[in-house]
Amino acid sequence: MSEELLNTTVEQEYDASQIQVLEGLEAVRKRPGMYIGSTSASGLHHLVYEIVDNAIDEALAGYCTHITVTINPGDTITVTDNGRGIPVDIQAQTGRPALEVVYTVLHAGGKFGGGGYKVSGGLHGVGASVVNALSEWLTVEVHKEGKIYQMKFARGNITQEMRVIGNTDRHGTIVTFKPDPEMFDTLIYDYETLHTRMREQAFLNAGLRIEIADRRTEDGPSDSMCYEGGIREFVLWHNRHKTPLHEEVVYMAGVRRDAEAEVALQYHDGYNETIVSFANNIHTPEGGMHETGFKTALTRVLNAYGTKTGVIKTDADKVSGEDCREGLTAVISVKLTDAQFEGQTKAKLGNAYIRTLVDSIVNEQLSTYFEEHPAVARTILEKAMTANRAREAARKARELSLIHISEPTRPRLIS
């Protein structure tokens, strides 16, 4: 077996000649997985998300109301927004146009100083340049102050300096790119994958219209999404094939310390738990502090209400967190100025104070909601207590089964 193991021994002397300095965007092309997670289909689609995230940052800042994503023939992508347009004036530190800096320098953008954006979802400020580095070619057009500015790149290198190509009465940014076949295992975009992500973003940004179209065929699918109800409608969408236990979606929101949180929830008659969380519009599939705060407060509020109304009489009657979340559909969305994600792909939110914020909002507002809607509160509490009883019954059954298995079998006497 030992012959099959990788030999990790290095014979060469370890000196300065082994130290590589990667200039510009070389680091991205050398280790793309560090920036987009993988070079599989997931990473391919991540390129689109990064450009869209930049457009959504404009929406969060209050300047963008419409985003369009187009899959073109040949699986190139065009993302159009009606935001302010990427700055085109000279950036002081580099002496180069800001547009060039955004697309050619890692960790460059309007997200670091706090002046350009209060909150943002882009990939730690490296999204545009990473997409550029991993594209066979990329063209960006900026409509700003009556002029159309254009710049072109190939694999992160400038092929056309920024220049004015016309006049316009619009404002915003248009980015078109072709993923580099040298970088990715697949180059075929899946419409449904992109559609799901765009629908998600439309729910999270109430009133923002996002359109997506597949132009690879004449009759390709398209959709236009705008949800004035925001995450309330997101919860209803998740429960569209379920039977809700209460008609109204419970909605809670609040602001503390330059951070805001909103939570929407509704219970159904099923048994599965669905909690979908986001930070600055970025899905956090592994949860994080915002989910922890929500779960803790939900359990506390239900037990407090049950105790206050006499439904919960002893500690043994108290419901666990798992009991409280049976049949629950919830969407949690937080926006904060200094989001700390664990990992470049933002799977988990790490800001500790967000836990306190979400806990406080849910504790206060859900308690008030239960006081004002006792019928809904009783329905939810009864479901949790039913789950508790079922869990206890299952535990006792397992214990009896273990006792039965552990009992020695007595030999029978044969007369």
What is each stretch, according to the model?
Residues 414-415:
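Hydrophobic alpha-helical segments, chiefly the membrane-spanning helices
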Residues 30-49:
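Conserved short strand/loop->alpha-helix "switch" segment adjacent to the catalytic nucleotide/phosphoryl-transfer site
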Residues 19-22, 42-45, 100:
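Alpha-helical membrane and juxtamembrane elements of multi-pass inner-membrane transport
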Residues 2-15, 25, 49, 57-59, ...:
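GHKL-family ATPase ATP-binding module
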